[in-house]
Curated annotation (Swiss-Prot):
It is found in: Cytoplasm. One of its GO terms (cellular component) is cytosol. This is Leucine--tRNA ligase. The keyword Nucleotide-binding applies. CDD domains: Anticodon_Ia_Leu_BEm (cd07958), LeuRS_core (cd00812). It catalyses: tRNA(Leu) + L-leucine + ATP = L-leucyl-tRNA(Leu) + AMP + diphosphate. Its EC number is 6.1.1.4. The lineage of its organism: Bacteria, Pseudomonadati, Pseudomonadota, Alphaproteobacteria, Sphingomonadales. A motif ('KMSKS' region) lies at residues 621-625. The keyword Cytoplasm applies. The gene is leuS.
Amino acid sequence: MSESGFSQRFNPHVVDGRWQKKWEESGCFHAKDNSDRPHSYILEMFPYPSGRIHMGHVRNYTMGDVLARYYRMKGHEVLHPMGWDAFGMPAENAAMERKIHPREWTMSNIATMREQLKRIGFAIDWSRELATCEPSYYGQEQALFLDLYKAGLVYRKESAVNWDPIDNTVLANEQVIDGRGWRSGALVERKKLNQWFLKITEFADDLLDGLKDLDQWPEKVRSMQENWIGRSQGMQFHFNFEVAPEGFDKIEVFTTRPDTLFGASFVAIACDHPIAKALAEKNAALPEFIADCQKMGTAAEDIETAEKKGFDTGLSLVHPLNPELKLPLFVANFVLMDYGTGAVFGCPAHDQRDLDFALKYNLPVKRVVAPSEAESNEAIGDKADTRAGIMVNSSFLDGLSSEEAKKTVIARAEKEGWGKGTTVFRLRDWGVSRQRYWGTPIPIIHCDSCGAVPVPKDQLPVTLPDDINFDKPGNPLERHPTWKNVTCPKCGKPARRETDTLDTFVDSSWYFIRFASQPDDKPFDKATAEKWLPVGQYIGGVEHAILHLLYARFWTRALQSIGRLDIKEPFTGLFTQGMVTHETYKDPEGHWLSPEQIHKDEAGIFLTESGEKVTVGRVEKMSKSKKNVVEPAPILDQYGADAVRWFMLSDSPPERDLAWTEAGIEGCWRFMQRLWRVAAIASEEASAGIDKDLQHRLHCSIKEVGEAIEGLSFNKAIAKIHDLVNAIEKAKASATRKEAALTLFRLVAPMVPHLSEEAWHLLEKEGFVAEASWPEFDPALTVEDEITIAVQVNGKLRDTLTVARDMPKDEAEKLALASEKVIKMLEGRSPKKVIVVPNRLVNIVA
């Protein structure tokens, strides 16, 4: 054994760096594409290079690292890569604020964060590292964009977009949260621009239907995607004008509730509907109303929660089922041009939005659905009745259920030629144009003669110019004096480059494929990539459910449709981890305080500088605004990587939030010292004898820890390790105790790799423990020889007995009847019946 032995305390400041260097030098975590081993692809969502990792990163990547190390020990060839989601607005903001080029700022941040991640000892294949801002990556993304363009899955059109007036760029609906830009927080406006779109709607049915096969995804995420895609069965039909405006004779409407047509009291169109535009030319007040509508974003949620406003056009429409009924036509701020037909009819009695609108503009409210016939004339107040029921006040539909009425109305509309049954989706095509510099240039050239012309692939990548400035808001590419001026590759005439860049969510929609295969001459090699794909286990935040995760599913399908891939789903398993939280603190004036500004003692919590008492607030997600962020670097300096990793896996189930506490990390540090002392037991000379209880605990631990890791129940794995350590510490010297201590370091190697490697080395074991095999358990040794059974009298628990497993029924009965508690309950009576359930209970019926 090494001369250093195990007499000293575990010192991570010496140990951590040594093993990190050895792992890197050996290349032991480099994945081999052509290995004969089973392939496992473990991936955490790659980070934006902000310049520092936070505790959320540490938790996320520790979980993935445990899986990667575990499956490597189980004999798998494991791909566990890391990269950087490196384009985006923060780099441009930094360029403006600090007078530094976005590339320089980004690459500096990447270098810093790479070293921070290496300090935690993650088993990452750094040979596959990528950054989306590198031409070697985004040039291949441009090639894929052109492939999709050729296949008709990319198009350009004028569209109402969500405009962020601070970032001066377009936002997808998913990037608008409560009416504000997801990064800037600015109130979003509606604006018309020529935009590039990806045809995600082409795959709407398949994206929706495919969710049912994702049985290793959280139900919450699948439900969120299902609602976002939003498939609706309904009817498209038209209303004729009573007196038609010039150029129009009818309005096409889509509804999911044709059964409520007899309850209609108005028709509303979007502010950018062709009829609204035509009417605005002749009505001086309408343009002002339309301009007010355009201050809203295009996201459905924001429109739904905004105050409902309408402009009465003075025109009327004829009801298709009751020609005597005339409905007023409004331009309304809650109707979207790109959903359905851009026109709806309102049934106030049974839709809250329509009711709010009707009450505001004094429109009729007519009940047409009631829970029973007796309630057919029950008045509607200020709350719409959305309950199911039967049709009332609806002519030939009366008495039918809503579902029957829908079918009846659609059948009549189709027979008479004024409507038809149809399916629509809430999902819109993905607008990917962004008016910013720091993104992937869209590889299109605009020519007055030829129109939009793809950049020839042999001219890719279209790289970003370095000589730009951010003195003015907006897109520097648009202002660049030379970059956008080119020759048309088709006709040779002067032309201009597309100055929009791609939404950064395009970058993250295929990076996991590039990790699997990185040839220089194409985006990826299909055969090589599919040795790894789909990703076996993907780990990241639930906030990406309808952003990145939906886009990645679309991108994979799009690539399959053009023959680039044979798979449709990118991620077999998805795990959404909880956040890392921390107490919040305020000074007497109510200002937020950071943990570094306070000190704690027995008397309470006080400001270090002034001694004033601090108010302790709720435990909340770590955030800069509330100053409750705990930086990983000083914690790593104090406790080492393994204690931090252990904390991240302990206590809370990984899908729940984890509260960071000093007491918790101190406890993890102490447990590292306990593990180190167990290593000394493993170094003992072998003793004779078998400890059956410890042997049973050991084999149960091997089984239970493995099952817990595979089930991503890391806190349960930690608990089982604690049980085993307790058992080893209590046991007397024996061959079993030495075996258990040796085995322990393979069991904890995925969680605390540095300590495990050091112990493995000092125990003179060959190679890395990271490359050792996961221990096997003997099923026979996981079965307890003795069990506890319940003893009941008349079905109520009266005693418990410890008996041999599989004890014969008659022996169990004798033991139960001999129980003093049972004898006391029977009071000398003979039992009427005794029921014995082997290995579980004895029930005495008195």
